[in-house]
UniProtKB/Swiss-Prot annotation:
The protein's name: Xrcc4-like factor 1
Keyword annotations of the record: DNA damage, DNA repair, Nucleus
Source organism, top-level taxon: Eukaryota
Any single GO BP term: double-strand break repair
A Gene Ontology term for the protein's cellular component: DNA ligase IV complex
Protein task: Involved in double-strand break repair via non-homologous end joining (NHEJ); the repair of a double-strand break in DNA in which the two broken ends are rejoined with little or no sequence complementarity. Has a role in meiosis.
Source organism of the structure: Schizosaccharomyces pombe (strain 972 / ATCC 24843)
Database matches in InterPro entries: XLF-like_CC, XLF-like_N, XRCC4-like_N_sf
Amino acid sequence: MSWVQLRGHRFHFIQASFDAESNEAVQVIHITDLVRVWSCTCSRNQIVNQAESERCPIDPFQTFETLVDVLAEVLVNVSSESRIQLRGSNDEGSLKIFCTSKIAKDIFLEWNWTLWLTPPETIAKMVWFPLINHHLFESETDTSPGSLMSIIRDQKSLLNDKTWFKEALNERSSSSNPSTPRKRSAFADIISPKRPRTRYDFV
């Protein structure tokens, strides 16, 4: 499984697998902000119970495989038109995904997942080590659009292009006014702040 950018969320990436034939791990979902990882595993019974309680328009008994396929489509497919929202808990111990998708005329599918924060070492095991391995041993052309590696390469290309630096430098030069007298800098105030004169009254 590869990490792909979560649709509509610039700094969050998702890794997910869906297997309608499994009973215990039909859905395995991970989300990262590149600092932490949240995860959840959903069994067949959990999905069926949630579909019943939320009055899902797709029958979880007769068309369970279809339901799983649709959930995978709306959550992972970068070209899907579904809307995804993230909501974190106050203690950041859990993360909720809310997904809304139009599956037919005037028929909408609404679904949510609750992911739980994993131990700190998970970020290295699931994100950084695979990225290093990919960089060292795999072809640079072997990346799909929207994947974490492709986004990193795009940003690297942007940094290597010096045009942005020259434009920023020219903009800063044009905005400065050489006739303006230099003032005491904030940094100078920090290291040697101005002090008011102390008056001494002698008796």
